[in-house]
Amino acid sequence: MATRRQPLIPGWLIPGVSATTLVVAVALAAFLALWWNAPQDDWVAVWQDSYLWHVVRFSFWQAFLSALLSVIPAIFLARALYRRRFPGRLALLRLCAMTLILPVLVAVFGILSVYGRQGWLATLCQSLGLEWTFSPYGLQGILLAHVFFNLPMASRLLLQALENIPGEQRQLAAQLGMRSWHFFRFVEWPWLRRQIPPVAALIFMLCFASFATVLSLGGGPQATTIELAIYQALSYDYDPARAAMLALLQMVCCLGLVLLSQRLSKAIAPGTTLLQGWRDPDDRLHSRICDTVLIVLALLLLLPPLLAVIVDGVNRQLPEVLAQPVLWQALWTSLRIALAAGVLCVVLTMMLLWSSRELRARQKMLAGQVLEMSGMLILAMPGIVLATGFFLLLNNTIGLPQSADGIVIFTNALMAIPYALKVLENPMRDITARYSMLCQSLGIEGWSRLKVVELRALKRPLAQALAFACVLSIGDFGVVALFGNDDFRTLPFYLYQQIGSYRSQDGAVTALILLLLCFLLFTVIEKLPGRNVKTD
């Protein structure tokens, strides 16, 4: 009896292998382009370049300070948010989650409107007869912006750790009379200390690879990071060899940070409890006052820049700016790039998770982890590094395109894969545990299973991943900074041009439109599954 020929690669493995091959091939092509353009015989002079080492030191120093100033206050803010229930708490938690995907230039514009020399606080001090001496440029401005972005995210992640503490532990501590420092040390700290290192490593990595923030608020050669030096080498000096060398250095640093972050990131098992969310009824006055002060300070950090964008955007230039065709051209460019990049990101992520899930089901854990890690690999090549590789590759072959839609879409999709993986990874595993045996018994597999099971059960996580990817793409400035021109510009690129030419009122309108577009796009995509889908 003739036996049926077995395929070289099982069908369930093809999606993951294809996505992994694509991601690795792109990363390898960018790396080779950087390597070929890097100065091969001038490395000794490079290592002796004092300015280069100043840039490297500043990159690490500002990232370290940003992580420190974000994580330490987040510990106390997370405790306050856990203990207090107040109107608007859910909205505040949602805002904490949104700051990570808020367009950087919008936040920078709001920060300048509040803390700048002509900002709200300067005007208030002037009316009180005081002198406003704070400058939002340089290291202090970079730290302020990074804390604005990362303190809410750190608070949200640490709050999850506090919510995992079994209610029985809290109840027992209350019965034993544990209060304040002793309660923090023996009950909360064992859970927080497992979450703090990976959170700090993540924030350090994000701040180390920060580009738009440093470009806008750097304030000169003394406050320059490696990514900004890459941009300057290509855009101002046009020194591809130096840009390639800096990009390789940045890639090595980021790869080390990614590996460190992955090593520190250990899943925290939720506590088994029958008293979820139990809180000590013995609530002291000074504790309530301290928590209220912390929450008010957090609101004063987050809300004024966002309110400034809205208030400053509604100015007398609004009708004139809205009548400019270039604004709507930039909006349409941003929208089509964001939607295309979001869809491509979700498709590639599902391909990786599909094959990874099948490998894990067959007890091939290491192979499954390798597939998932290939999606995280792109974190080792920040957008500006990947864009530099594409820039040099195209410049040395077919030439730079007039319109870089495809490059920007593809790069933004790759940069969003790690975030989409985090959104879809656990729901995908839950579905496997729930429906895998049923699908096997019914013979449902492949495309049929995807259509009947995954696409139905994953409606909400898929919409959330798509929303995150689209908003991350629409607010990106790092990639388009190299390829943008008068014929190809997105809203962030157009806003940067307005800020650079001191058209602050026009820029305020553009920042408001970009903020509203991100909010509407995120809300609409998140609502796509419909009201009947259960939400957290």
Curated annotation (Swiss-Prot):
Q: How is this protein activated or inhibited?
A: Transport is inhibited by the sulfhydryl-specific modifier N-ethylmaleimide.
Q: Where exactly are the transmembrane stretches of this chain?
A: 12-32, 58-78, 95-115, 134-154, 199-219, 240-260, 293-313, 334-354, 374-394, 404-424, 463-483, 506-526
Fetch the InterPro entries from UniProt: MetI-like, MetI-like_sf, ThiP_ABC_transpt
Membrane topology, record value: Multi-pass membrane protein
GO biological process annotation, one example: thiamine transmembrane transport
Q: Tell me, what is one Gene Ontology molecular-function annotation carried by this entry?
A: thiamine transmembrane transporter activity
Q: How does it assemble?
A: The complex is composed of two ATP-binding proteins (ThiQ), two transmembrane proteins (ThiP) and a solute-binding protein (ThiB).
What is the protein named?
A: Thiamine transport system permease protein ThiP
Organism encoding this protein: Escherichia coli (strain K12)
Write the lineage as a comma-separated list. Answer: Bacteria, Pseudomonadati, Pseudomonadota, Gammaproteobacteria, Enterobacterales
